[in-house]
Amino acid sequence: MHLNRTTMTRLQWTLTLALAGIATSVALTSSSSGVAQVQNANRTGELGSGTTCNLCHGGGSFGTSVDIVVLDPNSGQAITQYLPGEQYVLEVAVQTSQGTPPRYGMQATAVLDASSTNAGTFSEPSANTQLEDVGGRHIFEHNAASASNAFSVNWTAPLEGGDVTFYAAGLAAGNPTSAGGDEYAGATLTLPEVEVVIEIGGCTYDFACNYNAQAAFDDGSCEITSCAVEGDLDGDGNVN
């Protein structure tokens, strides 16, 4: 069979487009193992992430939202501020209000607001998650299309630095084998650093020899006689 040049060109374009489609499909499907792990990409929504999961995922309609909570591991209660150097549990949940998608995915990070650097460290991720680094940014993400919508990891707060913002991207995956039928949502949570106030004890009796106007409480150290004036009966420094 003889093919003219026009027919051959069309065949070449068809083959090129088909191969590109296969490559794209493979790339998107393989990201179910985590976009940081597969593509070295940050999709958390923080300033350095560039773009979101909407770049590849869409078409779904689940009323998707993302919840971020940081828990005290001892009480199990959500915290509203953190103590430097303490360990907490970061939980990310992908919620839906319309239907139940078969799979879920997520990616999250923690950033110091003042410096845009990593805020603390992650450790001991839950069974459906993994830890990655993208361009130096610590990433916590799903390790496979997850049947559970809940993801968790231990977070150790930075030793200092002020406010910390957690960024999380979540996916409700309508079709676990492709990027179609998915819906993305993002969320942030900002926690301030606990302001530690050190109270100074001292003598709060203003007639004492060692009176300390800066003392927050009396520590029983007041000394009256060492500076007493002869004839001063009430310790006010004057002869009565």
Set out the residue ranges of the language-model regions.
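Polar/charged alpha-helical tracts
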Residues: 5-6, 10, 73-77, 229, ...
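Primarily marks secretory-pathway-exposed extracellular/lumenal segments that are disulfide-
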Residues: 198-240
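Intrinsically disordered, low-complexity peptide-like regions
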Residues: 2, 38-40, 70, 180, ...
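Short amphipathic alpha-helical segments with coiled-coil-like heptad repeat character
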Residues: 2, 161-169, 214-223
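Sec-dependent, cleavable N-terminal signal peptides
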Residues: 1-37
